Design a protein with these regions (language model features):
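Terminal amphipathic helices with adjacent charged low-complexity linkers/tails
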Residues: 13-44
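A C-terminal functional module that forms or caps the active site or interfaces directly
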Residues: 236, 240-242, 246-261, 265, ...
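C-terminal functional extensions of proteins
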Residues: 137-140, 146-188, 196-197, 201, ...
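Single conserved hydrophobic/aromatic residue that forms the stacking wall/gate
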Residues: 2-4, 8-12
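N-terminal glycine-rich phosphate/adenylate-binding segment common to multiple enzyme folds
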Residues: 46-117, 250-251
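Short, acidic/small-residue loops that bind anionic groups at enzyme active sites
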Residues: 92-95, 103-130, 210-212, 263-279
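Active-site rim loops that border cofactor/substrate pockets in soluble metabolic enzymes
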Residues: 55-78, 82-83, 144-145, 181-241
Length: 303
């Protein structure tokens, strides 16, 4: 739509816009998108290749060539994912006119998750002004956008993916705090146990990351509190990557920091997929699209 045209006018190099000439002319009028490649899903010479790939990937689910063609013409996100799968694109951005589910579903069906990863999560890169914590105010917050239900195994995966994301985007080593309302067993509850178990799994399964918990937020960030609550922790008092115990906490947490601390909140950026696919809010502005496209490019470069 118009916002996408504006956004891509700013980051036009090597961009692909999927749409009919009529759609592009209608919404792109007045914006310089001359550097972008336009792919018409109804008249693309590569279309049969994508139909064949769709059927190859989904034939066990009963997808026929006719069904694949219809789905690709009806939902351009399927077309984008097939371009990625066939090596004709490095990543995809959607969501300005689609729900999160409609963005993620084609990616899960066609691109799948990374080897060893069972689910997709979403993080925000947070930039907090005048902040002494994290990496000079830079943090990764996860999961803030995707999965409402977690167990210890999946939470450990979020820790690994978030650690990798922090390294990719910030260029520094991540210190991952697994958050709870308890620090090192100070409270007893099934939810505390789930987080503590996730820490154990993450340490055993992903020895390359620095992760600890369970930690309360103040113990994760503030050195003086960390010295009291978790003095032996390699993360407490210096965390820069915060993994929340569930989606409610993550979504509320990033919005609190965004609104009350006037922080920049860049995302949600999806992690766990085999190729970069990212979601936009339907209330996004052109600048938001530029940011998410840029972050998708970073993910592709580090894939």
């Amino acid at each position: 739509d118009l916002r996408m045209s504006r956004g891509l006018g700013d980051v036009y190099k090597r961009q692909v816009i999927i749409g009919t000439p009529e759609e592009i002319e209608k919404y792109g009028k007045g914006y310089d998108i001359s550097g972008a490649t336009i792919v018409d899903p109804f008249n693309d010479p590569n279309k049969q290749k994508y139909i064949d790939k769709f059927v190859e990937l989904r034939s066990k689910k009963g997808v026929t060539p006719e069904m694949a063609k219809e789905q690709m013409e009806k939902d351009y996100m399927y077309y984008a994912c097939l371009m990625c799968k066939c090596g004709d694109a490095d990543g995809a951005v959607s969501g300005a006119c689609h729900s999160t589910g409609n963005t993620i579903r084609p990616a899960l069906q066609l691109l799948k998750t990374k080897p060893g990863i069972s689910s997709v999560s979403g993080f925000f890169l947070m930039e907090v002004p005048d902040c002494e914590f994290g990496e000079n105010g830079l943090f990764v917050f996860a999961d803030c956008a995707v999965s409402p239900d977690y167990d210890s195994e999946k939470l450990a995966e979020v820790a690994k993916l978030s650690s990798d994301s922090f390294k990719s985007f910030v260029g520094k080593d991540a210190k991952v705090a697994m958050l709870s309302f308890s620090s090192y067993g100070s409270a007893k509850h099934d939810r505390v146990t789930m987080v503590a178990d996730a820490v154990k799994i993450a340490k055993e399964k992903y020895p390359d990351i620095t992760v600890d918990g369970e930690l309360q937020l103040d113990a994760a960030l503030v050195p003086e509190v960390a010295a009291l609550k978790a003095p032996e922790s390699p993360v407490a008092g210096k965390a820069n990557t915060l993994v929340f115990p569930n989606l409610e906490a993550g979504n509320i947490g990033y919005k609190l920091v965004q609104r009350l601390a006037k922080a920049g909140a860049y995302g949600p950026v999806l992690q766990g997929l085999s190729m970069p696919v990212n979601d936009l809010s339907r209330g996004c502005f052109a600048d938001d699209i530029v940011g998410v496209v840029a972050m998708t490019a970073v993910q592709a470069q580090n894939a």
